[in-house]
Amino acid sequence: MTLDEAIKSLMALQAKLAAYGHAMGLLFYDGATTAPKGTAANRGQTMSILSEEHYKLTTGGETVALLEFLDAHKSGLNEKQQRMVFLLIKDIRNMQKIPMDEYVAYQQLLVEADDVWHRAKETSDFALFEPVLEKIFETNIRFAHYCAPEKDPYDYWLSEYEDGLTMAQCDEFFATLREHIVPLLKKIKEKPQVDDAMLHGHFPEEKQAQLSDYLMRTMGLDLDHVGLSTTEHPFTTSLGSHFDERITTHYLEENFASSMFSVIHEGGHALYDTGSADDLAYTVLDGGVSMGIHESQSRFYENLLGRSRAFTGFVFPKLCELFPELSGHTAEEFYRAINKAEPSLIRTEADEVTYSLHVMVRYELEKRVMHGELKVHDLPGEWNYLYKEYLGVDVPDDKHGVLQDSHWSGGSIGYFPSYALGSAYGAQLLRKMKETVDVDECLKTGNFAPINAWNREHIWQYGCLKKPGALLEQALGEKFDPTVYTQYLEEKYGEIYGL
């Protein structure tokens, strides 16, 4: 085999893997959106067959031989090809350590888990979800031991979502946030509370859907390649490549802001994915490099831009057009209402000040379950205890507590810290962007093009070509510093509450 032939085979292999990913992604997306309730077992059967074929293709002798050949001749490969080979070998080595029957069974379990989670949340019954969740945690612990027996199992999964991330780093990061957020929240509680009554009323779903379309277009999303559906829990997924991106939202007719900011958040994810360089499509380099970087983009658009005074001033006339009852209010009142800082039950509805406390609860619980210090059966009680301790709120039921997120049903254990990291990354990226882009002026006129161009140049185009830490440092021109984020919060909320 010549090197040119091997490179062609490398590209063909990745196209096949992308095709399997496309098919399995469609099954997941269908299950979460429009599939009838009784079809989970049917999808699970198909998923098990596809995942088995995917496993065989990934770990097969031909694939291993091809990648070993390319690795031995990597001096003849360009930067992108070298990175492709590195990532594929990493994936193969991990997958080879997991018995195929266990891998396939786990994929089928996740299909079942998604269905059970929906039913459990609907009825607020954790006991229904408990047996499936126990299997998910047990499998994640077992797979971590297979892949990296020398590592702590929770460290292994943290690093899978954010390359190199450890519990020690998370502990230090969260300690820094707590040091600033807890006193800030205490000062806010001593001030008169912001009035957010204007956000509550009756806002027809049809009008909210029109707002979603408007927001997606304003953000610069290409609606020929990005679709929107409704689900119980909003998410974003790429199907096959960055040319087919799907986002979802959840409409609450009593609160239009819920979906508004879900769409902006998921739209940020979609901008990142669709911003990958086109020559990365159908390769392992396509899409976001880590969940921390991904969340830096989603929460950048949702909060740093979407909840800014400049953008709310721009979007408020459109809101009044869609919801005439808002016309008796001002853009400034809207800005203050959507930035009301107050402990709450639901992570996705949380303000910027308290949001990281929601993440810390999940981090602490995951860490303890992964170490055998907490039983899955005891998660609801411990969840409720930590919400009282961290946020001072009483959890009324499982639906508004331990069952609120879809992440555990999808096997995403170790994901949650990425949200808080992403918020902090985003604040530092915004500070850097403002050196060359008049961000406020862009937002006042609804012109996202210069903002998107900066993100595309510094973040999006690279896909998975660079490691997340290196990509971030290159974009920032300095080391990551979480106090940039806490300073942003202190300045913004200090002004809103007159601290």
Give the predicted meaning of each segment.
Residues 1-163, 490-499:
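A well-structured
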Residues 2-3, 22-25, 32, 38, ...:
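C-terminal, non-catalytic "cap/extension" segments appended to globular domains
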Residues 10, 148, 265, 298, ...:
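Divalent metal-coordination and catalytic microenvironments
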Residues 10, 258-277, 295-299:
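Active-site recognition of the HExxH zinc-binding catalytic motif
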Residues 119-127, 160, 164, 187-196, ...:
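Inter-helical turn/loop segments and adjacent helix faces that build the functional surface
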Residues 174, 178, 205-209, 215, ...:
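All-alpha helical catalytic cores of prenyl diphosphate-utilizing isoprenoid enzymes
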